[in-house]
Amino acid sequence: MDERAALELVGGLVSRAGDDAAVVGDTALTIDMLHDATDFPSGTTRYTAGWRSVGASLSDVAATGATATAAVAAYGAPGFDDDELAAFVTGARDVCTAVGAEYVGGDLDGHSEFTVATAAIGDADHRVTRSGARPGDSVVVTGSLGRSAAAMALFDAGDTERANDLFQFMPRVAAGRVLGAHATAMMDASDGLARSLHQLAAASDCGMAVDSGRLPVADALAEVTADPVERAVSFGGDFELVAAVPPERVEAARAAVPGSLSVVGRVTAAADGVRLDGDALADDGWTH
């Protein structure tokens, strides 16, 4: 059973599962796990690992429209090197500070492989799920896509300094809070835009039609691959927000969202499926 099948199994047993974070009362809550072999390529600093792992949970909270307030991390490693542990905690603390949240500690454990489990909470005054998109809505994306794909290419090429910089994504907490007031459905693109579109379509019982010419592809990605659009769509690891917004609210959302907000397509009927430039888009993306 792969990760996707496992998630479907759990979703069939837990009725409230299926969104980026659970909302209990007025609190959003999420948990994530990352491993050395699947999430941290050779050359990833412990600072970047701290930033990225805690950032992933902050991003999940943001995807519900909640305001992230705090995060914790459990750090497992074969040994506890002073400099590595300090760098990890500093990265975790810094990403929280960057979005107005607080890093409040965690746990340590001896582990055969460097492994991190993180959790974050937030205030959920207004909840957005994956299941509210309707035909006619605009599909929007924050920021740019492909930073992580570019980082992986740079790690492979030995340019670890630049790769680590690209790997330190900014969780869209501020954007999620204001975009959530306009969106009918929203999630983050941690597993890739293609996968996110398929998940939103399935949850909302609709289709998605996206125009490659409208995609906000990161400049760094065009420098390292001959097909930046394909990588930006299918690679994942970017943690931008993908949302459905009624067309009459797009300009208000764009004016309110910090940073860029790109309209990349529209929500269609379920029978149309998920399409890129009119062609069926494969359900590809990051798999742990």
From Swiss-Prot:
Keywords: ATP-binding, Kinase, Magnesium, Metal-binding, Nucleotide-binding, Thiamine biosynthesis, Transferase. Catalyzes the ATP-dependent phosphorylation of thiamine-monophosphate (TMP) to form thiamine-pyrophosphate (TPP), the active form of vitamin B1. It holds the Pfam family AIRS. It is an enzyme of class 2 (transferase). Belongs to the thiamine-monophosphate kinase family. Pathway: Cofactor biosynthesis; thiamine diphosphate biosynthesis; thiamine diphosphate from thiamine phosphate: step 1/1. It comes from Halobacterium salinarum (strain ATCC 700922 / JCM 11081 / NRC-1) (Halobacterium halobium). Mg(2+) 5 binds at residue 191. Its EC number is 2.7.4.16. Mg(2+) 2 binds at residues 32, 60. It catalyses: thiamine phosphate + ATP = thiamine diphosphate + ADP. Gene3D superfamilies: PurM-like C-terminal domain, PurM-like, N-terminal domain. The lineage of its organism: Archaea, Methanobacteriati, Methanobacteriota, Stenosarchaea group, Halobacteria. PANTHER family: THIAMINE-MONOPHOSPHATE KINASE (PTHR30270:SF3). It comes from the Archaea. Mg(2+) 1 binds at residues 32, 107. GO terms for biological process: thiamine biosynthetic process; thiamine diphosphate biosynthetic process. This is Thiamine-monophosphate kinase. ATP binds at residues 106-107, 130, 190. Mg(2+) 4 binds at residues 20, 30, 60. Signal peptide: none annotated. InterPro entries: PurM-like_C_dom, PurM-like_C_sf, PurM-like_N, PurM-like_N_sf, ThiL-like. Mg(2+) 3 binds at residues 20, 60, 188. Substrate binds at residues 39, 286. Reaction mechanism of ThiL seems to utilize a direct, inline transfer of the gamma-phosphate of ATP to TMP rather than a phosphorylated enzyme intermediate. One of its GO terms (molecular function) is ATP binding. SUPFAM superfamilies: PurM C-terminal domain-like, PurM N-terminal domain-like.
